[in-house]
Design a protein with these regions (language model features):
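Sec-dependent bacterial lipoprotein signal peptides
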Residues: 1-17
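Cross-family detector of peptidyl-prolyl cis-trans isomerase
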Residues: 17-181
Length: 181
Protein backbone atom coordinates (compact mmCIF):
# COMPACT_ATOMS: atom_id res chain seq x y z
CA UNK A 1 0.00 0.00 0.00
CA UNK A 2 2.84 2.36 0.91
CA UNK A 3 4.60 1.53 -2.32
CA UNK A 4 1.48 2.38 -4.36
CA UNK A 5 1.08 5.74 -2.60
CA UNK A 6 4.77 6.57 -3.01
CA UNK A 7 4.75 5.60 -6.68
CA UNK A 8 1.61 7.67 -7.25
CA UNK A 9 3.22 10.70 -5.56
CA UNK A 10 6.40 10.22 -7.56
CA UNK A 11 4.44 9.97 -10.79
CA UNK A 12 2.43 13.09 -9.91
CA UNK A 13 5.63 14.99 -9.11
CA UNK A 14 7.20 13.87 -12.36
CA UNK A 15 4.20 14.93 -14.45
CA UNK A 16 3.80 18.28 -12.68
CA UNK A 17 7.42 19.23 -13.25
CA UNK A 18 7.19 18.84 -17.02
CA UNK A 19 7.26 22.05 -19.03
CA UNK A 20 4.17 22.67 -21.12
CA UNK A 21 4.86 22.50 -24.81
CA UNK A 22 3.91 25.83 -26.40
CA UNK A 23 1.47 25.64 -29.27
CA UNK A 24 2.04 27.62 -32.41
CA UNK A 25 -0.62 30.24 -33.06
CA UNK A 26 -3.00 29.63 -35.89
CA UNK A 27 -2.27 32.14 -38.62
CA UNK A 28 -5.39 33.66 -40.07
CA UNK A 29 -4.82 35.71 -43.17
CA UNK A 30 -7.49 38.38 -43.11
CA UNK A 31 -5.80 40.43 -45.80
CA UNK A 32 -7.03 38.14 -48.56
CA UNK A 33 -10.60 38.40 -47.25
CA UNK A 34 -10.33 42.16 -46.94
CA UNK A 35 -8.85 42.49 -50.43
CA UNK A 36 -11.65 40.38 -51.87
CA UNK A 37 -14.24 42.43 -49.99
CA UNK A 38 -12.75 45.72 -51.18
CA UNK A 39 -12.63 44.58 -54.81
CA UNK A 40 -16.21 43.30 -54.59
CA UNK A 41 -17.41 46.64 -53.16
CA UNK A 42 -15.50 48.61 -55.80
CA UNK A 43 -17.13 46.55 -58.56
CA UNK A 44 -20.55 47.02 -56.96
CA UNK A 45 -20.04 50.80 -56.72
CA UNK A 46 -18.88 50.99 -60.34
CA UNK A 47 -21.95 49.05 -61.53
CA UNK A 48 -24.30 51.24 -59.49
CA UNK A 49 -22.64 54.42 -60.78
CA UNK A 50 -22.88 53.17 -64.36
CA UNK A 51 -26.59 52.42 -63.90
CA UNK A 52 -27.16 55.93 -62.49
CA UNK A 53 -25.37 57.53 -65.45
CA UNK A 54 -27.60 55.54 -67.82
CA UNK A 55 -30.74 56.73 -66.00
CA UNK A 56 -29.51 60.33 -66.07
CA UNK A 57 -28.67 60.08 -69.79
CA UNK A 58 -32.17 58.75 -70.59
CA UNK A 59 -33.76 61.59 -68.60
CA UNK A 60 -31.90 64.33 -70.47
CA UNK A 61 -34.60 66.96 -69.84
CA UNK A 62 -33.94 66.88 -66.09
CA UNK A 63 -31.01 68.40 -64.26
CA UNK A 64 -29.58 65.83 -61.83
CA UNK A 65 -27.40 67.07 -58.99
CA UNK A 66 -24.67 65.02 -57.36
CA UNK A 67 -24.78 65.38 -53.59
CA UNK A 68 -21.67 65.36 -51.39
CA UNK A 69 -23.32 62.51 -49.49
CA UNK A 70 -22.95 60.13 -52.44
CA UNK A 71 -26.30 60.12 -54.22
CA UNK A 72 -27.97 61.90 -57.14
CA UNK A 73 -31.20 63.87 -57.12
CA UNK A 74 -33.45 66.02 -59.27
CA UNK A 75 -36.30 68.38 -58.45
CA UNK A 76 -39.66 67.37 -59.92
CA UNK A 77 -41.31 70.36 -58.23
CA UNK A 78 -39.24 73.03 -56.56
CA UNK A 79 -40.76 75.11 -53.78
CA UNK A 80 -40.13 78.80 -53.22
CA UNK A 81 -39.54 78.16 -49.50
CA UNK A 82 -35.94 78.70 -48.44
CA UNK A 83 -35.96 76.92 -45.07
CA UNK A 84 -34.29 73.49 -44.95
CA UNK A 85 -34.87 71.10 -42.05
CA UNK A 86 -32.65 71.48 -38.98
CA UNK A 87 -31.95 69.24 -35.98
CA UNK A 88 -35.15 68.49 -34.08
CA UNK A 89 -37.60 69.70 -36.75
CA UNK A 90 -40.51 67.36 -37.43
CA UNK A 91 -41.07 66.52 -41.09
CA UNK A 92 -44.22 65.22 -42.74
CA UNK A 93 -43.53 63.50 -46.05
CA UNK A 94 -44.61 60.77 -48.44
CA UNK A 95 -42.46 58.64 -50.69
CA UNK A 96 -42.45 55.96 -53.36
CA UNK A 97 -39.64 53.41 -53.62
CA UNK A 98 -38.78 52.14 -57.10
CA UNK A 99 -36.14 49.86 -58.53
CA UNK A 100 -33.82 51.13 -61.27
CA UNK A 101 -36.26 49.89 -63.94
CA UNK A 102 -38.89 52.30 -62.50
CA UNK A 103 -41.05 49.51 -61.09
CA UNK A 104 -42.75 50.44 -57.83
CA UNK A 105 -41.58 48.45 -54.82
CA UNK A 106 -43.43 50.47 -52.17
CA UNK A 107 -45.98 53.13 -53.13
CA UNK A 108 -46.87 56.24 -51.15
CA UNK A 109 -50.28 54.65 -50.56
CA UNK A 110 -48.59 51.63 -48.93
CA UNK A 111 -46.18 53.62 -46.79
CA UNK A 112 -48.63 56.41 -45.97
CA UNK A 113 -47.84 59.80 -44.48
CA UNK A 114 -44.54 59.61 -42.62
CA UNK A 115 -43.23 61.72 -39.76
CA UNK A 116 -39.56 62.08 -38.97
CA UNK A 117 -37.78 64.16 -36.35
CA UNK A 118 -34.51 65.27 -37.96
CA UNK A 119 -31.47 63.45 -36.57
CA UNK A 120 -33.44 62.07 -33.62
CA UNK A 121 -35.02 59.00 -35.23
CA UNK A 122 -33.76 56.03 -37.21
CA UNK A 123 -34.05 56.31 -40.97
CA UNK A 124 -32.03 54.89 -43.85
CA UNK A 125 -28.99 57.09 -44.46
CA UNK A 126 -29.87 58.16 -47.99
CA UNK A 127 -33.39 59.30 -47.14
CA UNK A 128 -32.17 61.00 -43.94
CA UNK A 129 -29.61 63.04 -45.92
CA UNK A 130 -32.04 63.65 -48.77
CA UNK A 131 -34.74 65.11 -46.53
CA UNK A 132 -32.22 67.58 -45.09
CA UNK A 133 -31.68 69.23 -48.49
CA UNK A 134 -35.38 69.58 -49.29
CA UNK A 135 -37.68 72.55 -48.70
CA UNK A 136 -41.32 72.41 -47.67
CA UNK A 137 -43.37 71.69 -50.80
CA UNK A 138 -40.50 70.11 -52.77
CA UNK A 139 -41.00 66.94 -54.80
CA UNK A 140 -37.60 65.31 -55.39
CA UNK A 141 -36.40 62.11 -57.05
CA UNK A 142 -33.33 60.54 -55.44
CA UNK A 143 -31.02 57.89 -56.90
CA UNK A 144 -29.55 56.04 -53.91
CA UNK A 145 -26.71 53.50 -54.16
CA UNK A 146 -27.34 50.34 -52.15
CA UNK A 147 -25.01 51.32 -49.30
CA UNK A 148 -27.12 54.46 -48.68
CA UNK A 149 -30.35 52.50 -48.27
CA UNK A 150 -30.61 48.84 -47.23
CA UNK A 151 -27.17 47.54 -48.25
CA UNK A 152 -26.16 43.94 -47.72
CA UNK A 153 -29.38 42.90 -45.98
CA UNK A 154 -32.15 44.40 -48.05
CA UNK A 155 -35.34 45.00 -46.12
CA UNK A 156 -35.97 41.24 -45.81
CA UNK A 157 -39.22 41.74 -47.71
CA UNK A 158 -39.39 43.36 -51.17
CA UNK A 159 -35.95 44.98 -51.40
CA UNK A 160 -33.09 42.67 -52.29
CA UNK A 161 -29.50 42.70 -51.12
CA UNK A 162 -27.23 45.39 -52.59
CA UNK A 163 -30.15 46.94 -54.47
CA UNK A 164 -29.88 50.55 -55.63
CA UNK A 165 -33.17 52.39 -55.32
CA UNK A 166 -35.07 55.39 -56.63
CA UNK A 167 -37.01 57.35 -54.02
CA UNK A 168 -39.65 59.89 -55.06
CA UNK A 169 -40.18 62.07 -51.99
CA UNK A 170 -42.71 64.84 -51.34
CA UNK A 171 -41.91 67.01 -48.31
CA UNK A 172 -45.32 68.21 -47.19
CA UNK A 173 -44.62 70.11 -43.99
CA UNK A 174 -41.73 71.17 -41.76
CA UNK A 175 -42.71 71.77 -38.14
CA UNK A 176 -39.82 73.80 -36.81
CA UNK A 177 -38.49 72.72 -33.44
CA UNK A 178 -38.79 76.24 -32.02
CA UNK A 179 -42.42 76.64 -33.13
CA UNK A 180 -45.09 75.71 -30.62
CA UNK A 181 -47.54 73.29 -32.18
Amino acid sequence: MKIKILSLLFLTLLVSCMQPIPRKPVTVKTTSFMEASVSLNKALNENEEKAFYEIIAKDSLSNYISSPSGFWYKYNTRSTNLYTPKFGDQLLYTFDVLNLENNIIYSAQETGLQTYVVDQQELVEGLRNGLKIMHEGDDVTFLFPSHKVFGYLGDENKIGINQSLIYKVQLIKINKKNESN
